[in-house]
């Protein structure tokens, strides 16, 4: 019996040892570039090191409390946000630097950040926040400039329908067919039947 306990103790020690991260755990696009891959492997190995931080916790807590729904913030939450923000900044900077190197420049520019955001599905949530680089629109005739919905001076750029990668188009339709769901009660279908059919044509 004592021998079994010894084996269990050995197994527990082995289970507590972190395995190096596999490539499947890395963020998208990180495995294609050696610099990004090495950065994320290093971050995953040192993810428990929250003592050294660059961003002020008081400022992060103030931003969190700006939301009217947030009443209290635990002491650990700003620390985790600080680490996440640092990782976000470094990753986006690396991706932007790669864009600067592609253009044979040694200075990081706003256009490099815009290009890094536009070329990464990870950062597509920033497309409305980061101004688009005007040179992208002139270099790629597929881009269509649309006025900003808020009336701002910076236009948004979109590819015409059928050009954007994603769900394939079927036939001449705009979207792939979706599954038909039964109608819910009170959605107006009963009214159409009472009026003699589909509600519009005879």
Swiss-Prot record:
Tissue expression as described in the entry: Expressed in flowers and siliques.
Gene field: NFYC6
Name of the protein in its database record: Nuclear transcription factor Y subunit C-6
PANTHER family assigned: HISTONE-LIKE TRANSCRIPTION FACTOR CCAAT-RELATED (PTHR10252), NUCLEAR TRANSCRIPTION FACTOR Y SUBUNIT C-6 (PTHR10252:SF39)
Gene Ontology MF annotations: DNA-binding transcription factor activity; protein heterodimerization activity; transcription cis-regulatory region binding
InterPro entries recorded: Histone-fold, Histone_H2A/H2B/H3, Transcr_DNA_Rep_Reg
Gene Ontology CC: nucleus
Highest taxon listed in the record's lineage: Eukaryota
Biased composition regions of type Low complexity, renumbered to the chain: 1-16
Biased composition (Polar residues): 17-29
Subcellular location: Nucleus
Keywords: Activator, DNA-binding, Nucleus, Transcription, Transcription regulation
Keyword Transmembrane applies: no
Oligomeric form and interacting partners: Heterotrimeric transcription factor composed of three components, NF-YA, NF-YB and NF-YC. NF-YB and NF-YC must interact and dimerize for NF-YA association and DNA binding.
Entry-linked SUPFAM superfamilies: Histone-fold
Region Disordered, annotated ranges: 1-29, 180-202
């Amino acid at each position: 019996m004592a021998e079994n306990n010894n084996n269990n103790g050995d197994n527990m020690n082995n289970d507590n040892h972190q395995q190096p991260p596999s490539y499947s755990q890395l963020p998208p696009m990180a495995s294609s570039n050696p610099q990004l891959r090495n950065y994320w492997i290093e971050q995953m190995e040192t993810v428990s090191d929250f003592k050294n931080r660059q961003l002020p916790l008081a400022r992060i807590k103030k931003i969190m409390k700006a939301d009217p729904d947030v009443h209290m913030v635990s002491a650990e939450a700003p620390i985790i946000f600080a680490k996440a923000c640092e990782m976000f900044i470094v990753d986006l900077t690396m991706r932007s630097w790669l864009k600067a190197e592609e253009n044979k420049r040694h200075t990081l520019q706003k256009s490099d950040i815009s290009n890094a955001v536009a070329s990464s599905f990870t950062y597509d949530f920033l497309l409305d926040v980061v101004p688009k680089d005007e040179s992208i629109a002139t270099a790629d005739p597929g881009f269509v400039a649309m006025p900003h919905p808020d009336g701002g001076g910076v236009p948004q750029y979109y590819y015409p329908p059928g050009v954007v990668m994603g769900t394939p188009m079927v036939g001449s339709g705009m979207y792939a067919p979706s599954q038909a769901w039964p109608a819910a009660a009170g959605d107006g279908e009963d009214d159409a039947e009472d009026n003699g059919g589909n509600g519009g044509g005879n």
